[in-house]
Structures are given as structure tokens and as C-alpha cells.
């Protein structure tokens, strides 16, 4: 797997002024690898140190989960309105949540709306993007954000 050196994200670094350089570096690497052990190996550190940095990042940025942390970061790196011009910002958030969370019930709890409403919104998103099935939405989301990174 190709890893982009966190030093290449100097402009994006300005979006997270409360993070230390080590925390930002860990955050960028974690968002690329999504694995604590791989980040620890890459940085020649113990996994406990990586976990501590990620916990500090979540606290300073004000998020609770790894999904939220990842979404905040890619939202700063990628202009979702440009990537998905056919979707509203709420639909983009639901699509991103659907791409990370395994169940619609989790998304419903996260957005405090009914599970059936999540399904209806996903169908609208699918239709707006011209996709055949819901599972293809996940792949499309990751393919599009990867191209824009």
C-alpha cells in the first residue's frame, strides 16, 4: 500500500491548529492505513503511543469515533460538493456514514433519524448518482474520494 507522507499535507495542517505535529502526523497516517499497528510500525513507535495520539486528536477535534475523525479529515482534504455535485450536504453525510458504518441502524442513531428514513434517503442518493444497487454506493464513495486525494 502506498502511503502519502504527512509532510505533503502542510496546507491541511492549518485546519487542525490544536494538534501537535506528532498528533497530526499520526492522524494523517491513521486515515490512510486505518490500522493502529501499521501506523506504529511505520513510525517505529509502540501501538500504545499511537492510541494515545488518536485519543488526543478525537478530544481536541471534538469527535467520538474513528469514523467521525476520518470524516472530518477527508472533509478538509476533499471538497465533497465538487466530488458529488448532485447531492446535498446532508446526503453526502449520509453517504459517508453508509460507507463506513456496517448497519443502517447505526447511521440512524448517529443522525437521530428513523432507520426507514435512512433507507429512503439512500435510495434517493442511489437514484441521483445513477447507481444500480446500494452496495455499489460504498465503492463509488471510496473511489471518488480516492481520486480527489
From Swiss-Prot:
Subcellular location: Cell membrane
Single GO MF annotation: DNA binding
Keyword annotations from UniProtKB, A to Z: Activator, Cell membrane, Conjugation, DNA-binding, Membrane, Plasmid, Transcription, Transcription regulation
Coiled coil residues, start to end: none
Cross-referenced Gene3D superfamilies: Winged helix-like DNA-binding domain superfamily/Winged helix DNA-binding domain (1.10.10.10)
Topology of this chain in the membrane: Peripheral membrane protein
One GO biological process term: regulation of DNA-templated transcription
One of the record's GO cellular component terms: plasma membrane
Primary subcellular site in the record, as a coarse category: membrane
Keyword Lyase: no
Lineage: superkingdom: Bacteria
Task performed by this protein: This protein is essential for positively regulating the expression of transfer genes that are involved in the conjugal transfer of DNA between bacterial cells.
Name of the molecule in the record: Protein TraJ
Gene this protein is translated from: traJ
